[in-house]
Structure formats: C-alpha cells, structure tokens
C-alpha cells in the first residue's frame, strides 16, 4: 500500500488557550470565589487561562469573547467594572481584539468602546483613549513541549544537531528532533531543541539561553504564532532546503507557524522482542529487530475513553480487517481503528472493537484472534520521540525550587526528567544534574539520589500518563506544592500532562 499524505491535525481547544499579561507583569485572573477579575497573579495557572472564541477575524483585528476554564466569560459592565459570568445579550462580553506590531494585544469593549486595563491589581474598562496601560501580552497556555508546523510549506520544524541548524522539512513529526521546549522568561521566548540547544538570531544553535536566543512572539487565535527579534527581523524558512533563519522579507505568510503540543509517538514490542512494524501492502508484523520509521505509531487517545488509535507513519491507522488480521489501512472515523487498552505493569494489552485481543500469529502477523489474553497479547511500549519528560499537573509543572529540597509540582518553569529505559514501560528517572530521583519514607522525592529506581509509566490519553512510584503508590500533585507518591487509586491529581 502506498503512503497517504500526512494530514496535519488542528490543535485541540486546550492548546489554543492563552494567559494575558498586563503592563505590570501580572496575569488576568478570574477569582472563582468572588466573581471578580483581577491582575495580581505572578504566574500562569488554571485561573489565569482563557480560551479566545472568535466570531469575526481580519488581518489586524478580531471580534472575540474570553472564556475561562470554568466555562464562564469575561464581561464588561456599563459602569466600567469587569467580572465574569454568562452574557445577557448578543454583544455582552464581546471585545474588539487588535494585534499590535509590538506583539501586544488590546481588548476594546464592543458595547462601550472602552479598553480593558489594569493598574497592576484591579481590572476595569473605563477609558476610551488608548495608552500603554491597555496593552496585554498573550502567552500560549499549552504545555511547553511543542511542535511547529508551517501551513505554507506543510512541513514541521526539525532540529539537526550535527549541523547545528533547524530545517522546516519534516513531513511527519515522528522524530524527537521535531519537538522543542518553549521557555518563557522576562517577556521573551527561548526555543530549546531536544538535544538542549537554543535557537538564536544568528545561523547557529547556542548551548545556553541568552539575549541572542530571546524572541518576541506574535500570537493569533487558532494557534498561529510568529517569532521575531523585536527589531524587524522575522524567523521563517529560507532557501531551497527551508533553513529556519532570521530575515526581513517573508513571502506569503511564511513567518506563521501553528504551535501545538508535541504528539506522543511510541513503539510496540512483542514477547519475543521484535518491533511491530508496517510491512509491504499495509501488513503489520512483529518482524523487525531494529527500530525504524515504520515501527513508529502516533498514540491518539481521548482521556474520557479507554480506547486508543494507533496512527502509523504511512498516514493510516491500525485497523482490524477480515480474517481478524490487523492492517495499517484505516481512516480516522472507522470504528475498527479503535482499540480498548488494558495495562499490566507498564505493558499494554489491546482489544479490538469486536472483543478479541491482539496478538502475534505463528507467521508473525498481528492478529485479533484471542478471547482471553495472556503473555503473547502483552506488548512492551516505549516512547519513540522523547528521551525526557516534562510533567504538568493540576497545580503546575514538576520541578525543583531553590527554597525547597523536595521536588515540587507547582512550578511555572519545569525541569526535564531524563528517561533511562529499564524494560518496556519501566524507566529510571534522572534529574538534570545527572543524579537520580530518590523517594523518602513519606512518599516525597529528592533529585539527588545515587541509585536508579524503577518508575512504571502508563498512558492515559494522547499526552496524559500516570506514574507508579517505587513505593507502589501513584505519583500525584498535592495542593501544598509538594510532589507525593501516596495514592492507591488513580485520581485527577495523579494524571500528568507530558
């Protein structure tokens, strides 16, 4: 079977949310208990996150509503006060959003014509005359592990560590080199590659963030972003090989990228240690002893459902076909492409929509033959496009803090957790300094252990996972800010975005 053209998926709604930073460096915040809106928060959390709902958009402006994660809207009242709730009329809560050249936004109430502003604490809408106090800096609220897709060239950005360059030439974002960490510091963005180098204003990668790696970001509703140096230079693909570099003359909107959460690509191994791979004519076999491009599958899963779709690098989905064979020829909405997943100590068991479990036949074909699963129906699963994790929970990112010796779960800036595979589904967690994660008798963690411990990872969604710690409990985010492993059951505080 020939490959189909890789179809880029639009960002999910949660990837399109933003935080809005006032001139004072504080975030627009809805106060759930007071029904008020303030701008006192110093970091981006759930209450500082807004979904931009567009009803009409032009090149430099759009008519929008701002919706909180609770489902309520930012509202401007006749007396200039700002609150949140449900709109009473068709224009109540509507703002004219203008995009400014300095990467700022202004929000003008559609009814009164007044601008949304803050004094660094309170938020109100009283002035008709535009000033610097009305400027808001949008910050994308999606997870910091991202990919960049060029809708003009229909390719993804890819870092080349051997040449120290970034190219926009990847048709399928299945490689670790397509993932980047988007750091936000002092109002600017730093783009870090998977090998921990930074994109710069000049034609090479830097080993450390600096003023030469700091970019301003223009943000548009719908996930579109453009990176610039603040002095007229824009970042866009150049030349026949589409080298990502700084220039002043992008053509046809080449400077715009769709910013998305880095997808999850995995490999599956049979009991015999062979990789599940797509072979000639869409056949799927456990035939390869080495990992290759056709052994990679995008893990697509709705967190509300225990079913998963596995999208191969040829653009098709694994699907159960006649004679119970599994083929890589499915399409997104076909019921036969959905498999129910079961977990056993980090190994995955897949059940077809017709009830039978996937296993390896004597001729090495992947088949949906078995009614009662056994070891032959368990597959080892390994991350294929990431050698590290960045975990975000209910209260923020997992990371270290200068004020604590324990690992925290409420940080604005995350730490990388380097993954050292032990066996399928089981990893050692290594801190950024090279030492290992250790666990105390209280179920807390420190980042300077001498010995490697086993952590069991199980996927719960497209970019969601749980971690079973060495003490036998699930790792969870605690409201105090301390990372704990003390949960016998999987609760919402045990679910981690990665």
Curated annotation (Swiss-Prot):
It comes from Homo sapiens. GO terms for biological process: actin filament bundle assembly; cell migration; establishment or maintenance of cell polarity. GO terms for molecular function: actin filament binding; protein-macromolecule adaptor activity. Its main location: cytoplasm. GO terms for cellular component: actin cytoskeleton; cell projection membrane; cytoplasm; cytoskeleton; filopodium; growth cone; lamellipodium; microvillus. It is found in: Cytoplasm, Cytoskeleton. Expressed in testis. InterPro entries: Actin-crosslinking, Fascin, Fascin-like_dom, Fascin_metazoans. SUPFAM superfamilies: Actin-crosslinking proteins. It comes from the Eukaryota. Belongs to the fascin family. Keywords: Actin-binding, Cytoplasm, Cytoskeleton. This is Fascin-3. Acts as an actin bundling protein.
